[in-house]
Amino acid sequence: MLHALRQAKAQATATVAARVGIGGPVGSGKTALIEALIPVLQRRGVDFAVVTNDLVTKEDAERLRRSGLIDPDRVSAVEAGACPHTVIREDPTLNIAAGDELEARFPGVELILFESGGDNLASTFSLDLVDWWIFVIDVAGGDDIPRKRGPGLLRCDLLVVNKIDLAPHVGVDLDRMLADARQVRGGKPVIATNLKAGTGVEAVADAISAAVLFRI
């Protein structure tokens, strides 16, 4: 179904790149996930670009540009100036325009990652903006986060539980947290990551590739 929708969209507009959202609370590891994905996607030959969102700065975009991991021109920044979810859900015009501009500058781009500003468990992406989206939480927030549910955690296409290496240091029962996450999501995918060590990054890249790039 998603493949058919992408084909219809490409035929109706000049937009051909798959668009993937990455949301989650402040400090959960959204930018770190992108940094970890960049070399994996490059190694796989994926032509991609990134759009970041911050409230009143371009901090995350500048971090990626300075990283040396990606051509700085392939990173665009949106300053939300309001609640982070406003520009990815209620009115994603700025992000849509940023994605369109990247596609115009890089005609071969096949994937654009949209990182939302840090938000809460209610944050979701408009399907006018993205084709598929990831929500990132981390164990430092407590192993009860999945049981609190929230639209972001429940509706995302992929839930990433990050910083699993910290579980013993913050008193989190990781096995229970992951089991609860899988239960409340009704079988939708959950991937555990330690981005510092690279744990789980290949699995996230595999999920993106299978879902929107149609590569197995």
Swiss-Prot record:
GO CC aspect terms: cytoplasm
Pfam families cross-referenced by the UniProt entry: cobW
Residue spans crossing the bilayer: none
A Gene Ontology BP annotation from the UniProt entry: urea catabolic process
Positions of GTP binding: 24-31
Keyword Chaperone attributed: yes
Domain of life of the native organism: Bacteria
Keywords assigned by UniProt, alphabetized: Chaperone, Cytoplasm, GTP-binding, Nickel insertion, Nucleotide-binding
GO MF terms held by the record: GTP binding; GTPase activity; nickel cation binding
Subcellular localization(s) per the UniProt record: Cytoplasm
Main localization category: cytoplasm
UniProt key word Transmembrane: no
HAMAP family, alphabetized: UreG
Summary of subunit composition and partner proteins: Homodimer. UreD, UreF and UreG form a complex that acts as a GTP-hydrolysis-dependent molecular chaperone, activating the urease apoprotein by helping to assemble the nickel containing metallocenter of UreC. The UreE protein probably delivers the nickel.
Family: Belongs to the SIMIBI class G3E GTPase family. UreG subfamily.
The protein, known as: Urease accessory protein UreG 1
Annotated organism of origin: Bradyrhizobium sp. (strain BTAi1 / ATCC BAA-1182)
